[in-house]
């Protein structure tokens, strides 16, 4: 369907029609097609229309801050925002991110995410979104979008739609893991389920005026997400009335004419495969219009939608070229990175865009910390004589906070999971640093053991301690990185790196053992949660750069925990239903993922099966006594 400028889009639409009416066919096509992977400074960049003084648009990850840059903030993940249940904090985080993206010369932020929604608790990228409850996700999705766009940057609601696992999302990626498939996985779903669950947050995004939507790698009912006329034309543009533009995920564009007719508006990053110098669109889209296979109005509509989003957020008033390079931290380099061609110029200006955003990050980290259990152990007084800090998750990454590319390792404290949905840390305050500072204020003793396998040393220290604070984690991320054999999706819900044994070693020797969990989602706590010496349990999620400070604010009672769990904590992995497709089930054809459970995911599924969880969706204690 044509964009028509309905509602709050009217002025932006009229301006877009006026400017696009002045463009040649080539100029319109230029807006729709990325220039290619690693060519320009951003992870995605379109052509511009210099004749009309329109620069190419810079698109950059991620949903929690600026990826592949510097002097920017690392915000708490979406799952932490969900745990706050706080619309205002979601907005403030979005606004702060938008300001940073704008100050770096970025026009389109590739976030926030509500796909995956969180159908499976072990889905690799659930943490990038909010919660498996579509209503909670939708509200916070919308507030985040409003914040980003009020700062003058186009927000991108992603990944549309039913992109619920990492396994088999891309043919080449699957081949790298030893699976030979002809096409990516197909999420097969009925109309009721898609409307009541997976489309719901995107409806909220459209109502919030989101400028861009990213279509996903997977197929939906055996039609690719970026050339699926039912999901793009019927559901999104006709039924929801979406007025912005649809971009492909990077490498999710599979056809020229078919995707154009199905509702795709922008090809990212523009080349068919990275650095191939070939494109389904660009020159080929121009030819398709000239030979009549794509109607002229469709390309007009693509360009109008792109420019309407640009004008709607006021980007024309704030536009500046990107002042950083995604591909190098060197100050000077060739303008075109991949071929190492063009003028040799200043590519990184090292602009500090952090403002005072550490304040909202610290507050969000504290306000998203869920108190799962408390037997009068918390808050701490600060006057505990001997404090034991136990576990690698309390300490620093021995490679440095950004030492693993796209955070693709689980070293030290977990404050951000892995993949393209990450940002560079400007610093990372660890729990060990923050707790030590608290103890030293009161002249106490504090000791840290950050080797999860040093159990005899843990037992010895725990026996002497007034309180033992045990730090454990569970990580996940995007499928192009495998960490400890977890190919994006988690292999299980158990704690990583001997975490259960670490907790038991402390609890068997210290009658005041407090467990802090940093994780991407639910973990299995059945072995120790009811141990009489485990006096408190906190879930701190993925809190970003102020991790230790946020946690100390809660531990020492400066912040009364008010967060509520945005997901269910089951007794076993099986309690959630077995939804993740990990093996080929269709020969070498596209793996088939039937959403036969319908709407019954997370707590809905627990209720339907009469399955009692350990901690319910929405559970969270506070220090208040009545």
What does each of the following model-derived ranges do?
Residues 1-626:
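Glycoside hydrolase catalytic-domain context in secreted enzymes
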């Amino acid at each position: 369907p044509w964009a028509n400028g309905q509602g709050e889009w009217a002025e932006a639409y009229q301006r877009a029609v006026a400017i696009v009416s002045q463009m040649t066919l080539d100029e319109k096509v230029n807006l729709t097609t990325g220039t290619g992977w690693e060519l320009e400074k951003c992870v995605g960049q379109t052509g511009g229309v210099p004749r009309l003084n329109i620069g190419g648009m810079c698109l950059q990850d991620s949903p929690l801050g600026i990826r592949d840059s510097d002097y920017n903030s690392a915000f708490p993940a979406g799952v932490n925002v969900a745990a706050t249940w706080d619309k205002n904090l979601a907005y403030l985080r979005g606004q702060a991110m938008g300001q940073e993206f704008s100050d770096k010369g970025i026009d389109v932020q590739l976030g926030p995410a509500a796909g995956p929604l969180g159908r499976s608790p072990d889905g690799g990228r659930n943490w990038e979104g909010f919660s498996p409850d579509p209503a909670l996700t939708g509200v916070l999705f919308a507030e985040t979008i409003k914040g980003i766009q009020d700062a003058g940057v186009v927000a991108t609601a992603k990944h549309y739609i039913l992109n619920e696992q990492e396994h088999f999302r891309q043919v080449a990626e699957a081949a790298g893991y030893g699976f030979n498939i002809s096409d990516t996985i197909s999420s097969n779903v009925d109309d009721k389920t898609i409307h009541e669950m997976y489309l719901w947050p995107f409806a909220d995004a459209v109502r919030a005026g989101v400028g861009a939507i990213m279509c996903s790698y997977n197929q939906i009912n055996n039609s690719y997400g970026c050339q699926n006329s039912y999901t793009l034309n019927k559901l999104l543009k006709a039924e929801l009335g979406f007025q912005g533009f649809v971009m492909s995920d990077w490498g999710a564009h599979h056809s020229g004419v078919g995707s154009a007719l199905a509702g795709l508006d922008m090809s990212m990053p523009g080349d068919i495969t990275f650095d191939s110098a070939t494109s389904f669109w660009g020159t080929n889209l121009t030819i398709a219009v000239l030979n009549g296979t794509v109607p002229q109005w469709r390309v007009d509509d693509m360009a109008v939608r792109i420019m309407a989003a640009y004008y709607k957020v006021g980007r024309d008033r704030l536009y500046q070229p990107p002042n950083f390079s995604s591909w190098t931290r060197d100050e000077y380099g060739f303008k075109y990175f991949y071929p190492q061609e063009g003028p040799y110029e200043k590519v990184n200006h090292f602009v500090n865009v952090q403002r005072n955003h550490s304040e909202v990050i610290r507050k969000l980290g504290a306000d998203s910390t869920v108190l799962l259990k408390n037997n009068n152990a918390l808050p701490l007084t600060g006057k505990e004589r001997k404090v034991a800090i136990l576990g690698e998750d309390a300490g620093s990454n021995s490679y440095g906070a950004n030492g693993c590319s796209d955070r693709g390792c689980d070293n030290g404290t977990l404050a951000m999971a892995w993949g393209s949905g990450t940002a560079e840390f400007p610093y990372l305050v660890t729990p060990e640093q923050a707790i030590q500072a608290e103890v030293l204020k009161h002249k106490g003793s504090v000791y840290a053991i950050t080797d999860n396998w040093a159990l005899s040393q843990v037992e010895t220290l725990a026996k002497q301690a007034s309180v033992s604070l045990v730090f454990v984690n569970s990580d996940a991320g995007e499928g192009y990185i495998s960490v400890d054999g977890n190919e994006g999706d988690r292999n299980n819900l158990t704690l990583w790196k001997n975490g259960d044994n670490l907790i038991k070693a402390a609890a068997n020797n210290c009658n005041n053992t407090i467990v802090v969990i940093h994780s991407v989602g639910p973990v299995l706590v059945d072995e120790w949660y009811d141990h009489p010496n485990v006096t408190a349990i906190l879930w701190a999620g993925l809190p970003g750069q102020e991790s230790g400070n946020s946690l100390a604010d809660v531990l020492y009672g400066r912040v009364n925990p008010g967060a509520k769990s945005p997901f269910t904590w089951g007794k076993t992995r099986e309690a959630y239903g077995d939804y993740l497709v990990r093996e080929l089930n269709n020969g070498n054809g596209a793996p088939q993922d039937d959403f036969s459970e319908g709407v019954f995911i997370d707590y809905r599924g627990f209720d339907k099966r009469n399955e009692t969880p350990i901690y319910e969706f929405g559970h969270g204690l506070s220090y208040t006594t009545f």
